[in-house]
A protein has these predicted regions:
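Bacterial N-terminal signal peptides that target proteins for export
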Residues: 2-12
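Bacterial N-terminal signal peptides
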Residues: 12-22
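Noncatalytic scaffold domains of N-terminal-nucleophile
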Residues: 30-69, 81-82, 86-247, 251-253, ...
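Extended C-terminal subregions enriched in glycine
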Residues: 467, 509-557
Length: 588
């Protein structure tokens, strides 16, 4: 095998993509033509090794079996996909307390079958009014270790309750009391701790033990709950009951708001009653792209996920991936080169669109993808340092959760939400049972300095009052013939984008059913560090070829936990990622 030589041709990515003339005629002339072919989508029980769940009327896929059952019950009772999504959102706050939440925030992409419109709902946490750019720096201008993570200054104004209530009022058919009722019962009567949750509690015990209410809920006899224990959350049940009775006002203006603010005042936090009262979920126009005839509908900023998902797909569309073969060296090579280019742009342009100008049109344009594609050659690889100078972004963890829902009427919902780290700040607002996020760490505490996940940010993501921090969450709906065809998403920090990408490519390019599409090994490249990360299961021969071409290939832990549903003429096919044994897909 001939060893590929690295190219040292420097191509600036700092393009003038704010203007309509992002591509010059000369460059456009060299654009690689788009490949429009796609694999035939099939499901054959006699041929497929992995088999999806099938249902005729509706389907729910989440990371926790009890939450999945809650969502399915809502569908069976006559609720639509949004009713079920809101019910699942509250249920996960009980049964997946490390990531599911009402003290955090996230994003939702909804397809409303009545209006035939897609909407992106932003309920990301927001910086308090008293937040300042330098609030995490000492007098010498250095970042104070842990201040943006495990103190009351780490907590952003929560958005989940506002987001869920907004969605239910706008697109749902049931009352808040109806959809929250199962969660109240789960919190009040308790549920059995799984091995996965028990391990997470053990890992995070030191942070939880610092706070009296957190320890009271998640510990017994000075040790965290373990597998088989019954976890009862009476205070959380009372808070959920207040929200069910009074709506979002209970959380943002009433008794719960007062308790959260009292918690802040006792410990030097910044959130005030004014902050709570002012919070609003925001409807945004989704990012839309096209890939081999399918329409990609995904989340816009302050998520970076949607833009760069479409950007990478635009680049890959120019290559016959089906001919390359799934997870072949040639396919992985093209994934890696496209991923590098997109992640370099991620570091430069993304932030809260209400505060910074983002060149969305340019970043997701086919022409821009064409120019980027011309830098990918068949006989050389470009080192990341030659794409754009910068500092590395080490990998983020899976401390987020995603769920997908489709119903018999053609509605579809994709939700990704989080507390940031496992159990967020570890702080429970006294008397509420509500874990509070540490999402303020997702801002750039100091441009050029990494956050908890090692992500380097710039001025576009600097701390500012009432600003929402940048995210990688990528809830996505794929449309075929103007109808929802695939709902997908995943946790995984910076790896969310590439995980969702591969779930889409595996179904469209390789014709995999949903179970196959999410069970095969994944790869990831995020520009810096300059390495291809792989899961176990990639062929040693493939690894050798990539290494001979000049790539650094690094086996790592599993990436993402996809929850995926596909709509076909005969019903729904779905699957929950086996990387989380607690996940479950159900339908009826």
């Amino acid at each position: 095998m001939m060893k590929f030589k690295k190219s040292f041709v420097i191509t600036s990515l700092a393009l003038s993509i704010f203007s309509a003339s992002i591509m010059t005629t000369a460059v456009a002339a060299n654009v690689i033509p788009t490949q429009t072919q796609q694999a035939s989508i099939r499901y054959d029980q006699s041929m497929d090794i992995f088999h999806p769940i099938y249902a005729k009327n509706g389907m729910v896929a989440t990371e926790q079996a009890l939450a999945t059952q809650v969502g399915l019950d809502i569908l069976k009772q006559g609720g639509n996909a949004v009713d079920a999504a809101v019910a699942v959102g509250f249920a996960l706050a009980v049964v997946l307390p490390n990531a599911g939440n009402i003290g955090g925030g996230g994003f939702m992409v909804v397809y409303d079958a009545k209006t035939k419109q897609s909407v992106a709902l932003d309920f990301r946490e927001m910086a308090p009014l008293k937040a300042t750019r330098d609030m995490y720096l000492d007098q010498d201008g250095n970042v104070v270790d842990g201040r943006s993570l495990f103190t009351h200054l780490a907590i952003g104004v929560p958005g989940t309750v506002a987001g869920m209530e907004h969605a239910l009022k706008k697109w749902g058919t049931m009352s808040l009391a109806q959809v929250i009722a199962p969660s109240i019962e789960l919190a009040d009567k308790g549920f059995v701790v799984s091995e996965t949750l028990g391990q997470t509690l053990e890992t995070e015990k030191d942070n939880l033990a610092k706070w009296q209410d957190s320890k009271r809920i998640f510990f017994k006899n000075d040790a965290p709950f373990t597998v088989g224990d019954l976890l009862v959350q009476k205070d959380l049940a009372k808070s959920l009951q207040l929200i069910a009775q009074q709506g979002g006002k209970a959380f943002y203006e009433g008794e719960i708001a007062q308790k959260i603010v009292t918690e802040m005042e006792k410990h030097g936090g910044l959130i005030t009653l004014e902050d709570m009262k002012n919070y609003r979920a925001i409807e945004r126009k989704p990012i839309e792209g096209e890939y081999r005839g399918y329409k990609i509908v995904t989340m816009p900023p302050p998520s970076s996920g949607g833009i760069h998902l479409v950007q990478i797909l635009n680049i890959l569309e120019r290559y016959p991936l089906q001919e390359f073969g799934q997870n072949s060296a040639k396919a992985i090579r093209h994934y890696a080169e496209a991923m590098k280019l997109a992640y370099a742009d991620r570091s430069e342009y993304l932030g809260d669109p209400d505060f910074v100008q983002i060149p969305v049109t340019g970043l997701i344009s086919k022409k821009y993808a064409g120019e980027l594609a011309t830098t990918i050659t068949t006989d050389t690889i470009r080192p990341s340092s030659e794409i754009k100078p910068g500092k590395p972004h080490p990998y983020e963890s899976d401390q987020t959760t995603h769920y997908s829902i489709m119903d018999k009427d053609g509605n579809a919902v994709a939700v990704t939400y989080t507390l940031n780290l496992n159990f967020g700040s570890g702080i429970v607002a006294e008397g509420t049972g509500i874990l509070l996020n540490n999402e303020m760490d997702d801002f750039s505490a100091k441009p050029g300095t990494p956050n908890a996940f090692g992500l380097i940010g710039g001025d576009a993501n600097a701390v500012a009052a009432q600003k929402r921090p940048l995210s990688s969450m990528t809830p996505t709906i794929v449309m075929k013939d103007d109808k929802p065809w695939l709902v997908t998403g995943s946790p995984g920090g910076a790896r969310i984008i590439t995980t969702v990408l591969q779930s889409i490519v595996n179904t469209i390019d390789y014709g995999m059913n949903p179970a196959e599409a999410i069970m095969v090994p994944r790869v990831h490249h995020q520009w810096l560090p300059d390495e291809i990360r792989i899961e176990e299961g990639i062929s040693p021969d493939t690894i050798n070829i990539l290494q001979e071409e000049g790539y650094k290939v690094v086996p790592k832990a599993t990436m993402g936990k996809v929850q995926i549903i596909q709509a076909r003429e005969d019903g729904f096919y779905g699957a929950s990622d086996p990387r989380n044994p607690d996940g479950l897909t159900l339908g009826y």
